[in-house]
From Swiss-Prot:
Catalytic activity, reaction form: a lipid X + a UDP-2-N,3-O-bis[(3R)-3-hydroxyacyl]-alpha-D-glucosamine = a lipid A disaccharide + UDP + H(+)
Domain of life: Bacteria
Organism phylogeny: Bacteria, Pseudomonadati, Pseudomonadota, Gammaproteobacteria, Pseudomonadales
Similarity comment text for this entry: Belongs to the LpxB family.
Pfam family, any one: LpxB
GO terms assigned for molecular function: lipid-A-disaccharide synthase activity; phospholipid binding
GO BP term, pick one: lipid A biosynthetic process
Keywords per UniProt: Glycosyltransferase, Lipid A biosynthesis, Lipid biosynthesis, Lipid metabolism, Transferase
Name of the featured protein: Lipid-A-disaccharide synthase
InterPro entries assigned to the protein according to its UniProt record, in alphabetical order: Glyco_trans_19
Gene from which the chain derives: lpxB
NCBIfam families reported in the protein's UniProt record: lpxB
PANTHER family hit by this protein: LIPID-A-DISACCHARIDE SYNTHASE, LIPID-A-DISACCHARIDE SYNTHASE, MITOCHONDRIAL-RELATED
Origin species: Pseudomonas entomophila (strain L48)
Amino acid sequence: MAQLCVALVAGEASGDILGSGLMRAIKARHPDVRFIGVGGPLMEAEGMSSYFPMERLAVMGLVEVLGRLRELLKRRKELIATLIDEKPDVFIGIDAPDFTLNIELKLRQAGIKTVHYVSPSVWAWRQKRVLKIREGCDLMLTLLPFEARFYEEQGVPVRFVGHPLADTIPLESDRGAARAELGLAEGPVIALMPGSRGGEVGRLGALFLDAAQRLRELVPGVRFVLPCANAARRAQVEQMLEGRDLPLTLLDGRSHQALAACDAVLIASGTATLEAMLYKRPMVVAYRLAPLTYWILKRMVKSPYVSLPNLLAQRMLVPELLQDAATSEALAQTLAPLVGDGSQQTDSFDQIHRTLRRDASNQAADAVLALLKDR
């Protein structure tokens, strides 16, 4: 079996998780493989030496990207040149579509097979991107079933592989065990999850803490857990906690334990909403963007929903409070009833979980290697 050279680029922590699982599955099928590209600590643990720190790609929001645009364009140009020189057997762009789709197009034009893992939200906004995907991508791997249907209609080769989180998160989690691990007493527990990026926590952190203070009046004996993505986020939240009296436990990472332990979640829109859904925890979703970013997106977005549970259910299964509607009072009043009974949400969560549970990393590896069998 000839050595394979697989290039991957991931732009943030969720992509690092997906990339490492895919790398592991490819190695199991084709042990003689070399990995190059850009990834985080999990991908590096699977054998990649990252060309530069993955964190340099982790920016969100139209306005926020502008401040880093020159660096991002320079890194992308250098990466394309390096990969054309290396001539990998396949390039796999993991999420980060504004960065990776252009790389895929240039590499495919240079005769390199290209795969995009995790569909951008083309079904929701900037639908013309599907033309670039069709031109630059030999195969699209989607995590969600409605995405695959969209690509089939657009004539893009696609495979729905399922979601790795649906594979790793159990269909039923042990709330009592998670509470014991985190040292949480009996009684209602709410997880606060204002996001993993600095900008998100800056816009939502204090708002969520204000909502928590109101929730203390609405839910007797409630306690809170807030998982911090890294030391910088923890420092950010600690600063916001000064002068507040909240029964709150800050965690370093451990977001899955927080979800397993809690009764309900106040959560930023993003991948974490999928995790909360897979843990069958009722939630209220909130989001605030820079005003200009929000104004632009409001005019571009075609989807009536922003959160993954609602997109998967194709209905307003979980409340979404966005921008000016996301006040501390509204968040608290909407979440409080769910602490006692969130079954209207959680019954549907179980059904969706089973649909997404398909052994994604192995499905994705099989699809990539099938693409290469004629090389």
